[in-house]
Amino acid sequence: MKLKILGFALLAVCVCAVCCMCGSDSKTPDYEFPDGPDPDPDPQPGDYPAGLTVTEFTDDLGGGKQCLGFVAVADLKANPKLRFNAVHLPQQKTPSRIHAEFASANRGTACVTINAGYWWAGNSLSLLVTGGAVKSIENQTVTRNNQTVYPVRSSFGQMSSGKFETHWIYCVLDDGNKPYAFPSALDNDERTNTYMSAPPTSKTPGAALWTPQEAVGGGPMLVR
């Protein structure tokens, strides 16, 4: 399964390993096994584990300006050791610090970090689930045309079976703000700026409790 990761998440190798290079001043040549396999090549800067590719691209923004972007593609069938993790950040941190803390917590080696949500004044406005625990819920209300409305947002997550799912999500008030999946954005259409005047509930037709192990979400659904 190939996944184009478009959110703030980590792809991490499930096993921790230390790679080191040792040398000495000895003139004695290393012993070579005549029938043994060729040694693995030394890791190079920027190398990623098997199954993970990162492609850099640029795009012209006009006016002599360019943007620099990256596309990360993970093939979990090619490398089952790759893992998708959502990381909750109550405080702002650099990717380097996130990677270091991820490793120090013995969670593996972080390979790619991507922003996957919205925030305002230091507070998350997006759904985030990690280890099956809901750490942040999506912004349940917004103001449009001086009215309070209830947008249903999209989310991307991995289930306990390993399967990935995308759903329209709302954390319902009548079931402790747990995330529920809906078959559509319901009566919300951001293209026409029309929204629901009342929040969906666990009893809304098509509602189903959603229990991912890792998930992020908060905006409109672009690809499914």
Identify the function of each model-found stretch:
Residues 24-25:
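Short hydrophobic helical membrane-anchoring segments positioned at the boundary
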Residues 31, 36-45, 181, 185, ...:
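Intrinsically disordered, low-complexity segments enriched in proline/serine/threonine
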Residues 17-21:
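C-terminal motif of bacterial Sec signal peptides marking the signal peptidase cleavage site
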Residues 144, 148-217, 223:
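A substrate-binding/cap region within the structured catalytic cores of diverse enzymes
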Residues 10-16:
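Sec-dependent N-terminal signal peptides of Gram-positive bacterial secreted proteins and lipoproteins
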Residues 1-9:
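Bacterial N-terminal signal peptides that target proteins for export
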Residues 29-174:
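Zymogen propeptides
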